[in-house]
């Protein structure tokens, strides 16, 4: 459905904004995902919106090439790995039935991952010197901003609030539980 709103002054149109809007239902039952009442098995990729010649700039031709690759492989979904993508990709996904896991740019919330891989000095992920209350407040606002921007895209079925974070500790639970609530409330 297309909604269009115009700001007018007398007979003169000052500005017009249009927004495509769609409705879908998402339900999880055990390990099964249902979209609009139908069971769905996600097949797809965590992708990156970048290219060696243009960097992170959006390019419609590259978007269409990526979409053709997704279709060729039989994928029905994509994850906006590590950061939000251009709204153009979400518009494309809305029109073509792709399901999207929309991710915040919260990468590196796992000090053990880098330290374990590179043998570096181990630091706790959550502490006054690393990931802390200030980080959590900014992270919460990033979640609100992402959901405010993308909530009308029916292709978005999951909000991913972090990429590969520390998740097995009590400190991680204390950090992330309030952020889950932020996402649910947004």
Residue ranges and their predicted role:
Residues 112, 185-186:
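Short, acidic/small-residue loops that bind anionic groups at enzyme active sites
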Residues 6-122, 128-176:
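Active-site-adjacent substrate/metal-binding segments within catalytic domains
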Residues 93, 183-184:
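A generic structural signal for well-ordered alpha-helical segments
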Residues 1-2:
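Short, small-residue-biased leader/transition segments that mark boundaries at the very start
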């Amino acid at each position: 459905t297309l909604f269009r709103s115009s700001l007018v002054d007398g007979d003169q149109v000052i500005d017009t904004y249009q927004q495509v809007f769609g409705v879908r239902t998402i339900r999880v039952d055990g390990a099964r995902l249902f979209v609009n009442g139908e069971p769905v098995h996600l097949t797809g990729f965590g992708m990156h919106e970048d290219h060696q010649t243009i960097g992170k700039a959006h390019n419609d031709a590259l978007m269409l090439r990526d979409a053709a690759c997704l279709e060729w492989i039989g994928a029905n979904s994509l994850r906006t790995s590590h950061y939000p993508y251009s709204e153009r990709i979400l518009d494309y996904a809305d029109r073509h039935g792709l399901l999207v896991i929309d991710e915040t740019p919260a990468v590196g919330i796992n000090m053990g991952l880098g330290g374990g891989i590179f043998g570096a000095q181990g630091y706790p992920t959550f502490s006054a010197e690393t990931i802390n209350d200030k980080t959590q407040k900014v992270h919460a606002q990033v979640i609100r901003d992402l959901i405010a921007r993308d909530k009308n895209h029916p292709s978005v079925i999951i909000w991913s609030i972090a990429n590969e974070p520390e998740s097995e500790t009590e400190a991680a639970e204390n950090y992330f539980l309030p952020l889950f609530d932020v996402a649910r409330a947004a």
